[in-house]
Swiss-Prot record:
Regulates chemoreceptor expression by phosphorylating the hda-4 class II histone deacetylase (HDAC) and inhibiting the gene repression functions of hda-4 and the mef-2 transcription factor, enabling the correct sensing and transduction of food signals. Role in determining body size, the dauer decision and serotonin-mediated egg laying. May modulate the Sma/Mab pathway and regulates development in the later larval stages. GO terms for cellular component: cytoplasm; nucleus. Keywords: ATP-binding, Cytoplasm, Developmental protein, Kinase, Magnesium, Metal-binding, Nucleotide-binding, Nucleus, Serine/threonine-protein kinase, Transferase. The active site is at D140 (proton acceptor). It comes from Caenorhabditis briggsae. Interacts with tax-6. One of its GO terms (biological process) is intracellular signal transduction. This is Serine/threonine-protein kinase kin-29. The lineage of its organism: Eukaryota, Metazoa, Ecdysozoa, Nematoda, Chromadorea. The gene is kin-29. Its EC number is 2.7.11.1. It comes from the Eukaryota. Its main location: cytoplasm. InterPro entries: Kinase-like_dom_sf, Prot_kinase_dom, Protein_kinase_ATP_BS, Ser/Thr_kinase_AS. Residues 383-412 are annotated as: Disordered.
């Protein structure tokens, strides 16, 4: 193994003060590799980009990413340490998280509980709130861009698509991942980046609590149709508060979508913690630019980095990310922050006593001219941990190209390095407790130990530590100190030692509770040689009936013919006393399967007596006959077709699957273009266990009955273009949007015979185009059948805008 270490070290690429190893991620233009700082002995992630392969637009995005990562500092955002430019390569050195992506954790463990989801989502929301307050939008929030750091803390990464945005500004660049993209991005419209981040956060929370995506699809077109439908199906195990939270973030209309302040104030976020206080604590924990540097770190850097004090102060206070001095100081400061060493505020510790209060004299010892680093402080800076290694074993981790090292980074701290013996390396798991390599005992104490006896090297020792004796002669050394070979070694009198404890131990020693080998043999010897006999199924049944047969709800007796045995085994589902009873024998609580003739005649007599008397029962009987006769006659219309009965649905999912509205039987879309109806009243949607969701046909997003005027649901426009041209333009626009429709041709007879063309959309929009005979114009009406479909309103606005663009002489009705 000693010869293998230099070989591995030769495979490390040296970039600046870093030993760069294996790749842990790849993108379109960049590669991320794990590296190790040679002075701080800390693992970092190095993102390398070949600038020569980028065009002008991507170069602008890269410089914008560098500007953003160097101006943010948050506990739940991966920290940037250094920016290096070497020839045509740009290197971004950032914090390394060994646990891996949140996506890999969810793929391995599935959905998490709402408590864990609340913790992770709160930390993500705190990071997004920090970015939005600085005028930065991420635009690529997803599980792949969220890492888990120490103690499962969220770390947000990848600011390649980030941008600056003011409150009154809209963005136009399409970016991000389609499953997390907001509907305004899928439509290609200008969008608010902060509202797009809120939509991605809603998808993220849905994935955490359900383990799947809210909009399932096999292609981008299917995804677009699923998102624009506005239907979000939430499983039953999600709480009402969480379901309401998800629906308010996944609102199609961005103006009605939540802001980051609304997200932090939602009641689901405050179930088990105070989110506002937690966010304030996170913001207060952000380390500002120090006005005075830590003298211990500065001394350590001067000894190992050969930098002067002025160079260190200028680079750190100026936050020069392109200087290795700033990165070294930040890495060492993070290590000191983890430990107990913090800046004391004084350049050197005060020495001496405070003196006498009466005399007013203070006895202060003279301070040394040259400050020194104590062993404890040096141990803090040389601290070893899974992310901060100080030995050569970390090089094997940097060079290991095995798939396990890249796919399962969280298993490294539980396994031993390759090629090391288990017993010889048993204490390596506690390397973080080792301090600096200095002499732990003073020379005075070392001088008190006797020098080693050189004569021991000339003796052939036995396994027990004593020289072999001649055959037939026993060793007669009553005390170990009388042994001739143990001259100057200190010995211990075994008679003064504590007695060996018995096998009685504390309850925490679990192995003592188990029986010994002798106890097991004695127990097996006492067992009988005869096998244990168990009762058969028939014997169990008879015993059960003998004990509980007198009860009211049990079988009275067993039949004479009982199957079973070896030849005819009883099926598993029939091994119960109730299955053994013959059909004639029943429970006492069961009703009779048939009526006797005497019982039948008695019931008929009671029925006739009740109808002969003029009482309430007879009147109800007559009214029931009349109602049933009337319903039977009116059930068939003149055309011979039966009317469809209104179906009652109890869940939103049933309504969406079968396209059933609360008033589907009484609502006629054709009447919109033939009658001047003023109001349409939709019923109250039922409350479900999933929460008060907004569906395609339910009235509002809350269980309240609402009334909307027809003017809000029907929009009309008069075009001067010919009738056929308007119809073709509408059909062409729908085909471009990839929205299916059904076309029908009808005739309107009031006030005069005119032709009308109808386009029916599955989303609940009816488009009617009719001819106005006197002016030879086209009358277009858009009717929204759904009561709360923002998608339908947006679609109607787009089609009306299209008609206005091609017809400058349009007019409203």
């Amino acid at each position: 193994m000693a010869a293998a270490a230099p070989k591995r070290r030769m495979g490390l690429e040296k970039i600046g003060l870093y030993d760069v190893g294996r790749a842990i991620g790849k993108g379109n233009f960049a590669t991320v590799r794990i590296a190790r700082h040679r002075i701080a002995k800390t693992k970092v992630a190095v993102k390398s980009i070949d600038v020569s392969k980028l065009d002008k637009e991507n170069l602008i995005k890269l410089e914008r990413e560098v500007k953003i990562v160097t101006m943010i500092d948050h506990p739940h955002i991966v920290k940037c340490y250094e920016i290096m430019r070497v020839d045509n390569m740009l290197y971004i050195v950032s914090e390394y998280c060994s646990t891996g992506e949140l996506y890999a954790t969810l793929m391995g463990k599935g959905r998490v509980t709402e408590d864990i989801a609340r913790k992770w989502f709160t930390e993500t929301a705190a990071a997004v709130s920090y970015l939005h307050n600085k005028g930065i939008v991420h635009r690529d929030l997803k599980t792949e861009n969220i890492l888990l750091g120490k103690d499962s803390k969220i770390k947000l990464i990848d600011f390649g698509f980030s941008n600056f945005q003011t409150p009154d500004q809209l963005l136009n660049t399409w970016c991000g991942s389609p499953p997390y993209a907001a509907p305004e991005l899928l439509l290609g419209n200008s969008y608010d980046g902060m509202k797009a981040d809120i939509w991605s956060m809603g998808v993220l929370l849905y994935i955490l609590v359900t383990g799947g995506f809210p909009f399932g699809s096999e292609s981008v077109n299917d995804l677009k149709r699923s998102v624009l439908s506005g239907v979000v199906k939430i499983p039953y195990w999600v709480s009402v508060e969480c379901a309401d939270f998800i629906r308010k973030m996944l609102v199609l209309n961005p103006t009605k979508r939540m802001t980051i302040q609304n997200v932090l104030a939602h009641r689901w976020m405050h179930i088990r913690n105070d989110v506002k206080k937690q966010v304030q604590n996170l913001e207060s924990s952000i380390r500002p630019t120090p006005s005075k540097l830590n003298p211990t770190i500065m001394m350590f850097m001067q000894q190992h980095g050969k930098w002067t004090e002025e160079q260190i102060i200028d680079a750190v206070l100026g936050r020069n990310f392109e200087s290795p001095i700033f990165a070294t100081y930040e890495l060492l400061a993070d290590k000191v922050k983890i430990g107990s060493l913090e800046g004391t505020g004084e350049e050197y510790p005060r020495r001496g006593s405070r003196g006498s209060i009466l005399s007013g004299r203070a006895n202060v010892d003279e301070q040394p001219l040259t400050p020194t680093i104590s062993a404890h402080q040096l141990a803090q800076l040389n601290l070893s941990s899974p992310d901060c290694d100080s030995d050569d074993s970390s090089n094997s981790d940097l060079c290991d190209e095995s798939p396990l090292s890249s796919l399962e980074p969280n298993h490294k701290q539980f396994t031993l390095p390759r090629g090391l013996d288990l017993m010889g390396n048993r204490f390596e798991n506690r390397r973080h407790t080792l301090c600096a390599s200095e002499q732990l005992l003073s020379p005075n104490l070392m001088g008190q130990f006797p020098p080693p006896n050189l004569l021991l090297n000339n003796f052939t020792m036995s396994p027990l530590g004593f020289p072999p004796m001649p055959e037939g002669q026993a060793a007669e050394f009553p005390f170990p100190s009388l042994h001739p070979a143990l001259g100057a070694f200190p010995t211990t009198d075994l008679s003064k030692m504590l007695p060996v404890p018995k096998s009685e131990r504390r309850a925490s020693a679990g192995e003592t509770l188990l029986p010994t080998n002798f106890d097991l043999q004695q127990h097996l010897a006492n067992l009988s040689a005869n096998p244990v006999s168990f009762p058969t199924v028939e014997e169990e049944g008879r015993s059960y009936l003998a004990k509980y047969g007198g009860k009211r709800n049990t079988v009275h007796c067993l039949g004479n013919q009982i199957g079973g045995g070896v030849q005819n085994p009883i099926p598993r589902y029939q091994r119960t006393p109730y299955a053994k009873a013959p059909p004639a024998e029943r429970r006492s609580s069961w009703a009779s399967p048939s009526l006797s003739q005497q019982q039948q005649s008695h019931l008929e007599k009671i029925f006739k007596d009740a109808l002969q008397t003029n009482n309430d029962i007879s009147r109800l009987h007559k009214e029931f006959k009349n109602l049933s006769h009337g319903c039977a006659q009116s059930q068939i219309t003149n055309e011979g077709s039966s009317l469809a009965c209104p179906q009652i649905s109890i869940t939103d999912e049933y309504n969406r699957q079968h396209n059933i509205a609360p008033s589907a039987s009484s609502f006629d879309p054709v009447s919109i273009f033939q009658k001047n109806a003023q109001e349409v009243v939709f019923g109250q949607r039922p409350a479900t266990a999933i929460g008060f969701s907004s569906t395609s046909f339910s009235g509002m997003s809350t269980p309240e009955q609402t009334t909307r005027s027809m003017d809000d649901r029907v929009r009309s426009i008069v075009c001067t273009l010919p009738f056929a041209e308007v119809v073709e333009e509408l059909k062409s626009s729908l085909n471009i949007l990839k929205i299916p429709f059904a076309e029908t041709q009808e005739m309107v007879y009031e006030p005069q015979v005119t032709e009308m063309r109808r386009l029916s959309l599955p989303s609940g929009v009816e488009i009617g185009v009719a001819v106005l005979p006197p002016e030879h114009k086209s009358h277009v009406e858009f009717a929204i059948i759904n009561n709360d479909s923002p998608t339908s309103e947006i679609l109607c606005d787009q089609l009306i805008c299209r008609l206005r663009m091609i017809d400058p002489n349009w007019s409203s009705e």
